[in-house]
């Protein structure tokens, strides 16, 4: 392949990693070479993916399949770092359920079912990442596992026990699932910066009843450094926001 003929920008990432490790947008051949070496060093199978940059907002879908029948458990709205390091695609927060109108939700659901059938998924969990814009849905990737942090978000939002559902599938037991309206808006925020930590402290002081759980390593004297992936966070915390409460103030900085 002649890399000089590639159209930039592009996204480079390892084929088999998680938590955003090694994922970066590149704008020229020199950046591509550096990103390729880094992604290859992180990949367990040595395979590096080079993809086009997709427009639109990013969402992910959690599914469970049983004998080839698929259940769409939840759709997550994903938030990414903005500003100087936005090309690293670092996730800074997740929201369940995603804020979608009926048409958008239907489009995502239809594409999700198509991709599960295309890959002949019969049993277990899948985590599908996608972009949505005015032109429709574009699939980024599919993984045969549940997305990180989703079990708690799904529990907080809907009351579903997705771990129990997956266990029942593995034991060949019938899944009992009835789609219902969310009871809460469930958020997980990650702590990468001093501002993130201050936002956590503000939330804990002013709205302690909204924090369903937290795992925070940061302290007032913590020195924050550049983070390249979710494993570099200084912790995270879950929020259960009542449906009629304005949740914009609880979202990651820069999002409404």
Where are these regions (language model features)?
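Residues at or immediately flanking beta-strands
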Residues: 47, 127-129
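Active-site nucleotide/adenylate-binding loops and adjacent lid/helix of ATP-dependent enzymes
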Residues: 1-49, 54-56, 66-68, 95-110, ...
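Short, flexible turn/loop "capping" segments at secondary-structure junctions
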Residues: 14-17, 88-89, 227-233
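ATP-dependent carboxylate/phosphate-activation module, predominantly the ATP-grasp catalytic core
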Residues: 52-58, 63-121, 125, 132, ...
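Active-site proximal loops enriched in glycine and acidic residues that flank catalytic Cys/His/Asp
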Residues: 141-144, 241
